[in-house]
């Protein structure tokens, strides 16, 4: 008898393992640029996330949620990045409890350095050396997120 569906625990362990490995590999790829900028890969991920939203201020809470860091930790990291000149922090005029963050010119330059680094890596690969459609990966991850949302909804969480 053939197995129709993957076992939940096998699925769970596979996903956790892949997420950890992907995160670790991204950190490795960011490490060189982070070292050059005298920041951590996590701080560089924050800069990249802010760069994707560079037209507007982002609340510290939203930023933390986007990269999976809790409020107190994200706030401290933002303070350090501000001291180093990568971001500006501004209290919201609508709600003074909310602190918004935006990249400075130095922060934008740091994000551009990451982009340059990845473009160089891409150029160094032989033509056809990597046959990956990034949009397909993103679409499949969105489908997984949607599936998990349905499970959460059914469970009443």
Residue ranges with predicted function:
Residues 1-7, 131-157:
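C-terminal regulatory/oligomerization modules of transcriptional regulators
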């Amino acid at each position: 008898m053939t197995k129709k569906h993957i076992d939940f625990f096998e699925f769970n362990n596979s996903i956790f393992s892949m997420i950890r490995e992907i995160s670790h590999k991204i950190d490795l790829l960011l490490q060189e640029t982070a070292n050059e900028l005298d920041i951590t890969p996590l701080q560089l991920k924050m800069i990249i996330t802010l760069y994707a939203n560079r037209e507007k201020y982002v609340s510290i809470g939203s930023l933390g949620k986007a990269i999976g860091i809790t409020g107190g930790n994200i706030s401290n990291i933002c303070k350090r990045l501000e001291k180093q000149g990568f971001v500006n922090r501004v209290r919201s005029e609508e709600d003074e409890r909310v602190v918004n963050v935006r990249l400075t010119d130095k922060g934008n330059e740091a994000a551009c350095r990451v982009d340059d680094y990845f473009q160089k890596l891409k150029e160094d690969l032989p033509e056809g050396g990597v046959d990956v459609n990034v949009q397909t990966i993103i679409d499949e991850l969105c489908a997984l997120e949607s599936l998990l949302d349905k499970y959460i909804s059914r469970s009443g969480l």
